[in-house]
A protein has these predicted regions:
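Short, charged, low-complexity patches
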Residues: 45, 49, 103, 107, ...
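Small-molecule pocket liners
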Residues: 34, 192, 243-246, 303-305
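Charge-rich, well-structured scaffold segments of protease-associated domains
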Residues: 9, 14, 25, 69-224, ...
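Histidine-centered active-site/metal-ligand motif
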Residues: 54, 58, 147, 245
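His/Glu-based metal-binding/catalytic segments typifying zinc-dependent metallopeptidases
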Residues: 26, 35-37, 221-277
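M16/MPP (pitrilysin/insulinase) zinc-metallopeptidase core fold and M16-derived inactive scaffolds
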Residues: 33-97, 269-288, 299
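N- or domain-start disorder-to-order transition segments that initiate the globular core
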Residues: 1-31
Length: 420
């Protein structure tokens, strides 16, 4: 059998307790990636407890009623697997990657940390210190921090702009009881998607999920988290850095919008690869930056297109102006036939290459369920990319670049970059 991704099948079933189960059987591999996704992230947090989702993610691995933290690590290491987690604006996910014969162990571990994590008091104090160091690392990494900053400026006073890590102040305010209470509130069956991709029988996987995750509770009483608005982000952060880091962003479209393939093409043309306009004009033609790129972010009800560059303070204004010029040019002129073909082929090629990873497939399937409520096949995606026209790109560019761009900067002359 060839390794054609189109020969695989994606099965969805709703478990008895309401958990959505997504499974993709891939006959050409011998591993399985399985993930538990909670459709709640930092965007749902009370502003005073910003960062609590990320802290809970850490605490899941610090011991359960059956296993110590060391035993959790030893069991997954003992089969050559991987166990990890991440927190985003709208999701929390923890996942395992193992050989197919060890899938029962992976699900046992995932269900154990979800249902039986104890959040030991001494570990809770220690882990808050670990997260504080993570925040310090983040504060010392302007090329990372600026991407949260730009969302806060683009959506002022809205939760989507809150950092996933929280702040020193909010981290200090989070108590163990807060974390346990919030964990119990958000990790309910109606918010959970469990996905797997790899050498796994869908019916067997669904049966195992029914068994291992049967105790996941149903929804609890809804709690309003809109009482307080997060603080307004400031667009300029003056800091003694070697470079000035800048982002220019505009509001875009939600994850599942019909124009999502058009936006992907527009973003690619702008700054998605080494042949993109920003890379060529900023780096290759003028040598102004090493890192320069653009990306799109799609959420449930909003999105953003963001361009980033890190450059010398002396050339930050010039770099910013090039970005704005490219926004204007794409809104006013059609891209050429060769540029369109290259962009389509790039999007299709990078997608096909990513599908060689079971973890990437698992995540793709989970996100489609979370944001669109259905599976989006490879054939549908490829057809969507092929259907993008130069007129489409011009139309979407005109729509989103007509918005006032948010300009943010971190560096010695950040005020000038933002205000000039």
């Amino acid at each position: 059998m060839t390794a054609d991704p189109q020969t695989t099948a994606v099965i969805k079933k709703v478990a008895t307790n309401g958990i959505r189960v997504i499974c993709e059987h891939i006959p050409t591999v011998r591993s399985v990636a399985a993930g538990v996704w909670c459709c709640t992230g930092s965007v749902a947090e009370p502003p005073a407890l910003n960062g609590i989702s990320h802290l809970i993610e850490h605490m899941f691995f610090k011991g359960t009623e059956r296993r110590t933290a060391a035993e959790i690590a030893a069991e997954i290491d003992g089969v050559g697997g991987a166990l990890d987690a991440f927190t985003e604006k709208e999701n929390i996910s923890f996942f395992a990657h193992v050989l197919y014969e060890h899938l029962p162990l992976a699900l046992d571990l995932l269900s154990d940390i979800l249902l039986k994590a104890t959040f030991p008091r001494e570990e809770f104090v220690k882990e808050k210190n670990v997260v504080a160091e993570e925040i310090r690392l983040y504060e010392d990494s302007p090329d990372e921090k600026i991407h949260d900053l730009v969302m806060g400026v683009l959506r002022p006073g809205e939760a989507i702009g809150m950092p996933v890590l929280g702040s020193f102040e909010t981290l200090k305010a989070i108590g163990r009881d807060d974390a346990l209470r919030y964990r119990n509130e958000i990790f309910t069956a109606d918010r959970i998607v469990i996905a797997a991709a790899g050498y796994v029988d869908p019916e067997e996987f669904i049966a195992m999920v029914e068994d291992y995750f049967a105790a996941v509770p149903g929804p609890v009483g809804a709690t309003s988290r809109k009482a307080a608005a997060p603080p307004i982000s400031q667009p300029a952060c003056v800091k003694d850095t070697e470079q000035t880091h800048l982002c220019v962003a505009v509001p875009a479209i939600p994850f599942g919008h019909p124009d999502r393939y058009v936006l992907a093409a527009l973003t690619t043309v702008l700054g998605g690869n080494a042949s993109s306009r920003l890379f060529q004009k900023v780096r290759e033609d003028r040598g102004l930056a090493y890192a320069v790129y653009a990306y799109g972010r799609g959420f449930h009800d909003s999105g953003a297109l963001v361009a980033y560059a890190g450059t010398s303070p002396a050339t930050a204004l010039e770099t910013r102006d090039i970005v704005l010029e490219q926004f204007a040019d794409l809104a006013a002129h059609k891209i050429g036939a060769d540029e369109l073909k290259r962009t389509r082929d790039f999007l299709k090629g990078t997608l096909m290459l990513s599908l060689e990873s079971t973890a990437a497939r698992m995540g793709r399937n989970a996100r489609h369920e979370i944001y669109m409520g259905r599976h989006v096949s490879l054939e549908e995606t490829l057809a969507g990319v092929d259907a993008v026209t130069a007129d489409d790109v011009l139309r979407v560019a005109g729509e989103i670049f007509s918005n006032q761009p948010a300009v943010v900067a971190i560096g010695p002359n950040a005020d000038a970059v933002v205000g000039a």
